[in-house]
Amino acid sequence: MKIGSASSYALIENGDIVHNYRRISKNRKDYEKSCENYREGTDTSSFLFHCVAMTAALCGDLWIYPKSFRCSGLLIWPVYVNFDLDESESGEYAKQAAMVCGKALLVNPLSKEPASRGGAFFFENGKVKQSLGLDKEGVLVVEV
């Protein structure tokens, strides 16, 4: 595999990397103007974390390759959206997540520049079960 940059995230516990996921879908960047070293990942396999089977996805992965992410445990889905994830919009994300997994945790960063509204959502069977509001810091605690 060639070395390059990637859109990725890692699940870390006690300083150890438990799982390192690299986005498999192309992001919205202009590839004509971007670094030629950018690489998409290929691994969508599940992993165990505290005896729970988990699958990782990033941003547009579930919209483009939903069949690659079938899981029986919990889907972890960090996204970057800078629009209001209101009830109807978060409901669309819940339905998309349900195509691959019965339970999903969607997390959006909170930042001023670039603007991102934050928020965290726990989806179960295509419905929003719990959420942390937009535009504020906090922790969403869910039982899986």
PLM regions: where:
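Generic detection of short hydrophobic beta-strand segments and adjacent strand-loop junctions
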Residues: F47, L140-V144
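Active-site catalytic loop in hydrolytic enzyme cores
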Residues: K2-G73, D86-E89
